[in-house]
C-alpha cells in the first residue's frame, strides 16, 4: 500500500506498564541501526513511549511491528493535542486532519496502565462521536477497509491525546495491541494463553498453516502441569512432554502425549522433531544456550521458548541472549521475539530455519 503519511512528529508505541525503559532503549537502538536520529520521551508506568523523530513516516516501515520486542502497537504520530477542551474535543482533531487522506477505520484507545484504564469509557464514547464527524468530513470510509491507513486517537488523560496513523499490514490487528484470548476451562494452566498468543503473534497466518500441521512431532520441555502440551495437542501434534512433575490426566487422555519423567533442561530426543517448546524458569542466558544446542544438534526444526528477564538492564539482557542464541545455533534462523500480553517479566522467542 502507499505510505500511511508523508509527515509525522514521531512514533507512539504501547507497551506493558513498567517496561517503558526497555521499549525506549529498543526504539533508540533500532532507529540508530536504521540511520535515523531521534529520542525517546517517556515516564515509567505510562504504558507507552513517544519516540520523537522528524522523519517518523520514513522510520516507521524500517521498524516493523512484528520485529519490535517490547511494542504492543506501533503508530505514526500526526499531532499531539495536550490541552483539549472537554466540551469540544472533535474540532481540534478535524483541524489536524484537514489535509489528511481518507482512512479505512478509526480506533480510539488508551494505554493499558493504571492511569490509562479508567479512560476506556471516554475512548468508547468519543469514538462513537468522532466516527460520524469524520465521515461527514469525508475522512473515514463507511465500512472498515484494510487497504487504507487506519486512524488512531490515543488518550493519555481526558484532555491529552495523540492523533496517529497506522498501516494495517504493519501494526497490531487488535485494539491496544492486545489479542482477546479466552482461557478455556479445560486448559491445565494460564500459561496455555502464552503459547496460544505466541502462535497468533509470532507467525503469519500462512506460516501457522504451513508450520503447525496435524501429525507433527513436538517436545515440551518442563511441561508440567501441561499447559503448553495441551495447546500443541489442540494443533493435533504428537507431543513428548518432559518433566519430573505430573501432567493433568485429561492432557494424557488425548492419546497424543507421551510423558517422560526427566529433566527438561538436559533431555534431548533420539530422532529430530518438528517442534520444541520451553517455558522453564531458568537464567535467560542458560536457556538461550540450551535452545541454541537444540538447533546446532538438529534436534528440532522450529522452537518457541521463553526467556525470563532480570529486574535490571532488561533490554541489554534481551540483546545479549538473542545474539548468544543466534551465534551458537550454528545455522541461519529467522528469530522473532515479543513481550506478549500474557508474558510477565519475560519475552517469548520464535526460531525457525530461513526459507
UniProtKB/Swiss-Prot annotation:
Principal place of residence: cytoplasm
Give the catalytic activity: cytidine(2498) in 23S rRNA + S-adenosyl-L-methionine = 2'-O-methylcytidine(2498) in 23S rRNA + S-adenosyl-L-homocysteine + H(+)
Q: What is its EC number?
A: 2.1.1.186
Provide GO CC annotations from the record. cytoplasm
- Per UniProt, what is one GO molecular function of this protein? S-adenosylmethionine-dependent methyltransferase activity
Give the GO biological process terms. Answer: methylation; rRNA processing
- Pfam families with a match to the protein in the record: FtsJ, RlmM_FDX, RLMM_N
Residues at the active site: 308
Q: Where does S-adenosyl-L-methionine bind?
A: 191, 224-227, 243, 263, 279
Subcellular location(s) per record:
Cytoplasm
Alphabetically ordered keywords of this record:
Cytoplasm, Methyltransferase, rRNA processing, S-adenosyl-L-methionine, Transferase
PANTHER family membership: RIBOSOMAL RNA LARGE SUBUNIT METHYLTRANSFERASE M (PTHR37524), RIBOSOMAL RNA METHYLTRANSFERASE FTSJ DOMAIN-CONTAINING PROTEIN (PTHR37524:SF2)
> Subunit comment for this entry?
Monomer.
Quote the function comment for this protein: Catalyzes the 2'-O-methylation at nucleotide C2498 in 23S rRNA.
UniProt family annotation: Belongs to the class I-like SAM-binding methyltransferase superfamily. RNA methyltransferase RlmE family. RlmM subfamily.
Q: What is this protein called?
A: Ribosomal RNA large subunit methyltransferase M
Amino acid at each position: 500500500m502507499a505510505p500511511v503519511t508523508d509527515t509525522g512528529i514521531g512514533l507512539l508505541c504501547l507497551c506493558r506498564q513498567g517496561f517503558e525503559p526497555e521499549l525506549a532503549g529498543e526504539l533508540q537502538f533500532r532507529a540508530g541501526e536504521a540511520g535515523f536520529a531521534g529520542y525517546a520521551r517517556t515516564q515509567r508506568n505510562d504504558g507507552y513511549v513517544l519516540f520523537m523523530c522528524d522523519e517518523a513516516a520514513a522510520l516507521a516501515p524500517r521498524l516493523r511491528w512484528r520485529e519490535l520486542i517490547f511494542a504492543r502497537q506501533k503508530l505514526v504520530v500526526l499531532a499531539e493535542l495536550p490541552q483539549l477542551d472537554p466540551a469540544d474535543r472533535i474540532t481540534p482533531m478535524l483541524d489536524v486532519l484537514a489535509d489528511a487522506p481518507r482512512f479505512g477505520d478509526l480506533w480510539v484507545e488508551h494505554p493499558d496502565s493504571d492511569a490509562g484504564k479508567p479512560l476506556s469509557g471516554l475512548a468508547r464514547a468519543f469514538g462513537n462521536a468522532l466516527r460520524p464527524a469524520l465521515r461527514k468530513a469525508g475522512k473515514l470510509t463507511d465500512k472498515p477497509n484494510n487497504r487504507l491507513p487506519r486512524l488512531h486517537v490515543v488518550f493519555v488523560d481526558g484532555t491529552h491525546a495523540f492523533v496517529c496513523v497506522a498501516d494495517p499490514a504493519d501494526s497490531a490487528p487488535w485494539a491496544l495491541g492486545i489479542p482477546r484470548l479466552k482461557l478455556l476451562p479445560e486448559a491445565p494452566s494460564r500459561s496455555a494463553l502464552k503459547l496460544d498468543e505466541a502462535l497468533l503473534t509470532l507467525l503469519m497466518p500462512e506460516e501457522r498453516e504451513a508450520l503447525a500441521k496435524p501429525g507433527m512431532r513436538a517436545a515440551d520441555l518442563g511441561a508440567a502441569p501441561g499447559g503448553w502440551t495441551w495447546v500443541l495437542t489442540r494443533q493435533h501434534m504428537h507431543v513428548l512432554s518432559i518433566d519430573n512433575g505430573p501432567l493433568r490426566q485429561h492432557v494424557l487422555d488425548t492419546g497424543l502425549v507421551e510423558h517422560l519423567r526427566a529433566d527438561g533442561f538436559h533431555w534431548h530426543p533420539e530422532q529430530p522433531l518438528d517442534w520444541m517448546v520451553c517455558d522453564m524458569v531458568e537464567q535467560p542466558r542458560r536457556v538461550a544456550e540450551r535452545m541454541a544446542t537444540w538447533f546446532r544438534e538438529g534436534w528440532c526444526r522450529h522452537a518457541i521458548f521463553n526467556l525470563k528477564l532480570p529486574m535490571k538492564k532488561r533490554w541489554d539482557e534481551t540483546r545479549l541472549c538473542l545474539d548468544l542464541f543466534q551465534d551458537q545455533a550454528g545455522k541461519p534462523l529467522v528469530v522473532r521475539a515479543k513481550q506478549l500480553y500474557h508474558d510477565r517479566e519475560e519475552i517469548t522467542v520464535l526460531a525457525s530455519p530461513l526459507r
